[in-house]
């Protein structure tokens, strides 16, 4: 076991897959000589050269389209968005090409493509560079969507994403790159479509992902001290949602709290509520509650920025309210 930062875990995953498979390549702005805006691709250029670690102009629609073409013709490109918000400029390519070509070609084309990069709130990067785009991409048919949350799952998930024959959008949070954790030195893979049970409990199911996993775990000691026993699931897969793992948990706890950094309107939480009500309504002792970011552009001011996203004290209050109110009703 060795203790590594998340950005190092992501780089190790990329390096290992490039070493094993000559078709794996990296494409994006400053991914080569500079080593990536968050150093996820540092030193890969010197090892693999210009043809496999390709610096591009600031033209997201162009190099994303190029990567899609490369995937169709047999390569396994990894597109790094310097910031995931920039990929809105390539939304047409991601939606109409990457997401649909396997279907519209009658299965004649596969698209082994990973689109990865940083996003999220917390570094005072302003409204345009602090967007939460998970739900934007969730609506596109044909995409798989993953959000890593620890160095361990970041490495295992990225290796699985690179090997997958379908396009995978891989979300990384800007505030988690310097998170450290011991990870195995031996190779391991993590399935792209499975949630992780972070903590087992019996009172309430907390569904979360990415940075909010850590806000939830920060709230746990106070909840446990006050006699509450929550079960915590890190969704990891945002498309498809792992409704089987969610079902197992909800059938045990009968209460659900969703904690997300996504916007409240039409966010990941909204889709979760829809699926839980569709599949598990009779199992619920209380309405599903979601804690989401406010539907406003992210402020540049640090205090205002922090106020737009869910904090641990809000999670504590929500758990207590849901559990206490539903116990009163059921008794």
Curated annotation (Swiss-Prot):
Keyword Protein biosynthesis: no
Binding sites annotated in the UniProt record for K(+): 113, 161-162, 164, 166
Cofactors required: thiamine diphosphate
Subcellular location: Plastid, Chloroplast
Keywords: Chloroplast, Metal-binding, Oxidoreductase, Plastid, Potassium, Pyruvate, Thiamine pyrophosphate
UniProt keyword DNA damage, yes or no: no
Disulfide bonds: none
A molecular-function term among this protein's GO annotations: pyruvate dehydrogenase (acetyl-transferring) activity
Source organism of the structure: Porphyra purpurea (Red seaweed)
Task of the protein: The pyruvate dehydrogenase complex catalyzes the overall conversion of pyruvate to acetyl-CoA and CO(2). It contains multiple copies of three enzymatic components: pyruvate dehydrogenase (E1), dihydrolipoamide acetyltransferase (E2) and lipoamide dehydrogenase (E3).
UniProt name for this protein: Pyruvate dehydrogenase E1 component subunit beta
Class of enzymatic activity (EC top level): oxidoreductase
Principal location class: plastid
Subunit structure of this chain's protein: Heterodimer of an alpha and a beta chain.
Gene that produces this protein: pdhB
Enzyme Commission numbers on file: 1.2.4.1
PANTHER family reported in the protein's UniProt record: PYRUVATE DEHYDROGENASE E1 COMPONENT BETA SUBUNIT, PYRUVATE DEHYDROGENASE E1 COMPONENT SUBUNIT BETA
Residues the entry annotates as binding thiamine diphosphate: 60
Single GO cellular component term: chloroplast
Matching SUPFAM superfamilies: Thiamin diphosphate-binding fold (THDP-binding), TK C-terminal domain-like
CDD domains attached to this UniProt entry: TPP_PYR_E1-PDHc-beta_like
Reactions it catalyzes: N(6)-[(R)-lipoyl]-L-lysyl-[protein] + pyruvate + H(+) = N(6)-[(R)-S(8)-acetyldihydrolipoyl]-L-lysyl-[protein] + CO2
